[in-house]
Each structure stands twice: as structure tokens, then as C-alpha cells.
Amino acid sequence: MLVNSTCPHDCPSTCALQVEKLSNTKIGKVRGAPENTYTAGVICSKVARYKERIHDPNRILKPMKRVGAKGSGRMMTITWEEALEEICDKFTKIEREYGSEAIWPYYYAGTMGLVMRDGINRLRHEKKYSGEHQTICTNQAFNGYMVGAGKMLGVDPTEIKESDNVVIWGTNAAITQVNVMSHANEARRTKKAKIIVVDSYRNATAKQADLFLCVNPGTDGALACGVMHYLVKNNLHDIEYLKTFTDFNSEFMAHLEKKTPDWASSITGIKKTDIEQFAKLLGNNPRSYFRLGYGFTRQKNGASNMHAVASLPAILGSWKYKGGGALMNNGSIYHWDKTLIEGLDCIDPKIRLLDQSRIGEILLGNKEALHAGPPVMAMLIQNTNPMSVAPDLNKVNKGFSRNDLFTVVHEQFMTDTAKMADIVLPATMFLEHDDVYQ
């Protein structure tokens, strides 16, 4: 029996799946569903092997309580009743002694299901626990793109096959977005389109490119400005489009005057001739599709980099062509009422917002990171593994090692973070619960 489903992972493709259901507790093969016109039956090897993950003998299937030192992973099995009772008792005592903000629910994108990912916020808001400022992944990219494109939306990725140039910037699509490459290669095969890759190292995607620009990390904005300078100087920009649909003005043009390809080359490490070749390809073929990733935004100037790069399809007028424009994220096209899921009707604006990227400093009592509020004395962690992915892991490890920190981890496997927990709760996988994905 085949059951339709959707991939839950933090990948832009949101692949449609067909899952072989062998019984109510066992699955067989996982395949791509051909009905989705974008993913078209293609899925990555990670999801194709989900049978191995869901039936892995090392899965956590029962609640556990720590019996060894923090980090040892030594646990004993307990009942759900025992686990929930201890969690509630500890949280209640901490709230009475330190206030509700001493408890910090912490999560991210282990699943992209709106209920299983964001539902933790309902508990947070109802109980007035500390908020979470989600800074690890997307903030710089989102802000830069909205300044450069206006809204968090882009061109339907199925239009890639109509493009004359497919620019893959700051994402290793051959590994992380296999469907992008399927459509890009179709455009190259049927329309003789050029695949242009901008990244800071020669990855699997770069090896498939017609033109690869290896940019020094953090200098993508300079490359974009150098290209725009060349376009303007050689009258390859779309003046009518700029006048009609953008806020580009004389001040912006003056800004570009000194941003020559020579200037960009000295900063980016890319040859002047390669920058000019890139600009010519775009200027002579404005039906260009820019697939923008997050990689080039994860530094202090990340938003500025994204702003500059997102301005390229505007100065070219690419947006007016089928197969032209840009895509970074299409989140703005969905209009969910998430009041029930997240408890949006009981948000207290006075509750502090703690930076998830500074979890190490927060757990070690940095007053500024804590906004001069109470120490974090308890955490409920879902859908993320901060002991592996958070910045400054030495501080994170030291923070989680505190004997006075009560940590609850909701997880599928015994991760590094789960090994630090006082209580571990078993988490379902996407085929074991209902959810909504966008």
C-alpha cells in the first residue's frame, strides 16, 4: 500500500513522497511522488533511506532519566507519568523561586511541520517562559532579501527550465536542493542555458557549472556591486524597469560609480575578466533566474550581501521575464492563522527574548545576554541539537554541564544534547504523526 506524504526536513524543495506502508508499524521504500511538478518524483538519498532511520534499533522509544554524570548518556527507563511529573514539579519550583522567565523553551528546524515545530510556543506564551530570538539561520538573509526584493517571495522554481542563465548563489544545490539541479540541467539541455555558480569553495554544484566564481567569504556584495557597475556603464541595465518598478535613483547610481570590476576583484579574489564575463552573460541574457541560498549571509555583513545580490535581477529587469527573477524564500505567499498553534493570543510583550545563538553565554550567566533578568534554570529542547550546532561550543558545553540546570530534551536519538539531559522524552518521526507543511 502506498501512502502520500511530504518531506519534513528544512530544505526548500518540500518533496512530495510516496511511502510503502507494510503495516501500521512498519514501512518499506520511500520514493518521490511524481505528481508534484517541481520535485517530479526525485528525492535525496537521505529521505530515500528513511526506512533505516524510522526502524533504527537505537531510536529512543521510552522516557529516560539521567543516572550518570551530565554528558555520560547514562540513563534509566521511566514511565511517561514519572517523566511528566518530575518535569512539572521542577518547572513549578523554578518558576516559584526565580520567576517564569527562568525557564527557556528552545527549538529550531528539526521538523518543518507547523504543529510539531512551532507548537512549543503555545506553552511558552501561556506560561510566560523566556522567548527565543531565532538568529542561527535566516535573519540576515530574510532582512537583506526583503530590502532588495520587497517581499519574502520569489519566482516559481519550475520556471528555471525557461531561463537563459541559472545563477546558483551561496547554496550547494547538488547536495541540498537536488531539484534545483534537475530543472537547471533541463534548461541547459533544452535552451542552452548557462549554469553559473557563486560560492566560496569548489563544491559539487560548482563542478557542474559553466562558470564558477570562487568568492572570498563575506565579499558577495562587492561582487554584485562590481557586476552592477559594469551593467550600468555598458548600458546593459533595464532603465524602464528600474523607473517603473524600483526605487533605484541617482544616489544609488552614484554609489556604483566607484564599484568597478577592478575594485570588486581586489576584494573578492575573482579575476576582473571573470567578473566581466559574468556581467556580460547577465546583461545579454536578462532572462536569468537567481536561486539564492543562505550561505553568503552568515556573517556580520550578511544582510548587506543579500541586499546587493537581490538587486541584480532588478537592475537587469529579470523579473519581467518568464524564467527570470529570484527566489530565496516564498514564505510570504502563505497566510496561516497560527494563533492556536503558537498561542499568539497570550503573548506578553514584556517577556524577554533570548538570542538562541548566544546559548553558551546565557547558560553561563552573562547579564547582558540575559537582559539583566533571572538566570536560565531549566530548558525544554525540541527539534535542535545545540551541543553540536550552536556557536561557541566550549561555552555551550560548560553551560549544559551546570549541576543546577534542569534540562529536558525531546528527541529521536541520543544526541550530544540528549546526553546532557536530566529527562529525555521520545519523539515521533514525520510518518508517525499528522502535521502541516508549507
Model-inferred region functions:
Residues 103-104, 166, 286-292, 377-379:
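Generic beta-sheet signal
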Residues 1-234, 248, 271, 382:
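N-terminal export/assembly segments and adjacent metallocofactor-ligating motifs
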Residues 104-106, 197, 214, 289-293, ...:
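A structural signal for short, well-ordered beta-strand segments and their strand-loop junctions
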Residues 229-249, 387-397:
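Membrane-interacting alpha-helical segments
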Residues 209-214, 421-428:
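Active-site regions of enzymes building and remodeling cell-envelope glycoconjugates
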Residues 13, 96, 100, 236-237, ...:
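Intrinsically disordered or highly flexible coil/loop and linker segments, enriched in small
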Residues 227, 246-364:
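Active-site phosphate/pyrophosphate-binding segments
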Residues 117-186, 191-197, 205, 221-225, ...:
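Extended redox/cofactor-interaction regions of prokaryotic respiratory oxidoreductases
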